[in-house]
């Protein structure tokens, strides 16, 4: 019986001398609801916890209370400079972590979805700021193309060319532009407008259009229908 008690006592002493396991940080679940994701502070708390966790002091094993005085004094002398260095690192880390937090408070917090959508070309570009342009009265006048004021001589020559042929070729257009001092686009537009005026005033339709109209396949004419009201 005495031997068993001694064996149990030795086992208890051995178990008491073992160092306690380090305390692990509690796992925190993030709520991935839409309302939480759209908040500007989504993910900020997790980053702060990581910074403090990285800069924190790891738990060291406690020295055995039953050890002699020499070992305890030696461990205290060794742990004191280490703890002082670690405390300095913690202070430096806290000062560094506090400085970006102040800068982030000055800046506007944008939600995370702004950096992951089609509104930004690059994930780090952030939301775009569009500058409003000042409206000038001169812009409206510049957009409109000024009408060409033809002289009497230019009009006579253009009408003569139009009587010979309603469709002008490129060579004739270049020759008229050099002779009359006009651009080729001005001459081309004048011929197009002249043909449109004649077609609109005469109302002439070609044989193919008349045939299609007879079959009910082509009819661009508009007619007004008046409904008779019953008295």
Curated annotation (Swiss-Prot):
Entry keyword set: Developmental protein, DNA-binding, Homeobox, Nucleus
Which SMART domains does this entry report, sorted A to Z?
A: HOX (SM00389)
Does Membrane show up as a keyword for this record?
Answer: no
| UniProt DNA-binding residue ranges | 143-202
Give the Basic and acidic residues compositional bias ranges. Answer: 43-56
* Keyword Nucleus found: yes
SUPFAM superfamilies in UniProt: Homeodomain-like (SSF46689)
Q: What is its main location?
A: nucleus
Query: In Gene Ontology terms, what is one molecular function of this protein?
Result: DNA-binding transcription factor activity, RNA polymerase II-specific
Q: Which domain of life is it from?
A: Eukaryota
Q: Where is this region: Disordered?
A: 1-29, 43-105, 121-148
Q: Which GO terms describe its cellular component?
A: nucleus
Instruction: Supply the Gene3D superfamilies for this chain.
Output: Homeodomain-like
One Pfam entry name: Engrail_1_C_sig
Listed Low complexity bias regions:
68-102
Where does it live in the cell?
Answer: Nucleus
GO BP term, example: axonogenesis involved in innervation
So what family is this one in? Belongs to the engrailed homeobox family.
Q: What is this protein called?
A: Homeobox protein engrailed-1a
Q: Write down the species.
A: Danio rerio
